[in-house]
Amino acid sequence: MEAFRRGERSPAEELEAVYAAIDASPLNAFCHLDREHATIAAGVADVSLPFGGVPIGVKELDQVAGWPHSLASVPLRDEIATGTSTQVQRIRDLGGAVLAGQTTSSEFGGVNVTRTVLHGVTRNPWRLDRTPGGSSGGSAAAVAGGIVTLATGSDGGGSIRIPGGFCGLVGLKATFGRVPMSPNAHYGSLTAVQGCLARSVRDVARWFDVVNGHDPRDPLSLLRVEGWEAGLGTLTDQVRGMRVAVVPDWGDAVVSPEMWDLLAGAADELIRDAGLARVDGVDTGLPRMGRAWAVSGSVGTAAVLGDRWPACKDDLTPEIRASMENNADVYDAHSYALIERKRMEVNEAMAMIFDPVDGVDLVITASNPDVAFAAEGPLPKTFGGIKGGAGNNGKLTFPANLHGNAAISIPAGDVDGLPIGLQVVGRHHTEPLLLELALLVERNRPWPLIAPVVQGAPS
């Protein structure tokens, strides 16, 4: 951005370089390019805006009017968006970003591996045989691989934090409602939030400066908060003394011991550098979601597919097909009420964990139970040699979605060249404090900004 303002490089030149990188990339991070409109936008970009002239990727679950809106699913491959997501509209119109194209996602955003029948396999720029995660896998791969500086993401169960952890990026899951889900916001999506994947804490803060704030089309969206970027580095006194629980197995998760040993060291450093107060013995237990979490996702998928199911089942990715088949018997009001009861149980438990008097201010855990797994899948069932089941892959992240908390994944080192992420979860409305903590990590444990795109295992 500064190079644009100094006249050293133009947005048009940057966009041309982005498209050249996409054409040459082995990552399969993009599934639709809008060269014509992006070229026009780059030519007239206002470089004084926060992201003026900067090409970005747009996750394919977002909407851009006139672009495909397949939700990464073959049965919807001919759908075209008639509106534009509020986040995308704001980052384009208020932020000045240039929409280069659409990044790949897992089908319906329902799996944390970005591999679909429609678009094929998206690969991790740190090792091409590994996944960037999901569902915002294409966005994470594109940013970590140096193709674009930023890309949109969404997080309904970890879909920003999981790929952020796998790809060595900053991934902020904001408080529920921070960024409007419009157009077409609906009460069935009470866990999902909008955001971005970025290499730096400052870019994330600047992004939210642009996109946050109420939209009447989403009645659950929050009022605007100013000063995200300006506040960076000014909140050290506010974070000092915050009570923190370090919980490697949050949500009954199984975590790789080797990975956690490294993350525990990063957690200790953060606690020391920020002056946090570690609290042991606080009950951080959560009710087991069991089948309820899978059923809740399948209900949404069933609503989107409508009469196409079950005739379309052979066109679906294995995990989505299996989820639909396994949960087809519970698509009724009584079963959905049981799901909501389970959500309420989790809400009560989370409220106790973060109780202002008897609880903690922060929970530190991992972003993922292990390093990135095979790009083609399947979802792993063992983690550092310990059995955990396929459902273990999202256990660390979904509690913040169910309760609506703010949470962030921060790059915290690597295991054999594969990035690992430290997840910090706070109360609602604590995003500035989480960004302050991430800034401390960024300054004291700087991470590589762009991954070396390599094939197979590191030498």
Where are these regions (language model features)?
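Short, well-ordered beta-strand elements within core beta-sheets of diverse protein domains
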Residues: 1-6, 75-79, 192-199, 324-331, ...
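A short helix-breaking turn/cap at a secondary-structure junction
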Residues: 173-261, 445-459
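Glycine-rich, small-residue loops and helix-cap segments
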Residues: 18, 53, 59, 93, ...
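Gly/Ser-rich catalytic/binding loops embedded in alpha/beta enzyme cores
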Residues: 1-156, 274
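Glycine/threonine-rich flexible loop motifs
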Residues: 69-78, 256-257, 373-380
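Acyltransferase
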Residues: 11-16, 43, 229-230, 257-282, ...
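Short glycine/serine-rich loop segments
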Residues: 83-85, 89-215, 401-414, 418-421
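Short helix-loop capping/hinge segments that flank enzyme active sites or metal/cofactor-binding pockets
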Residues: 51-71, 238-247, 295-348, 409-419
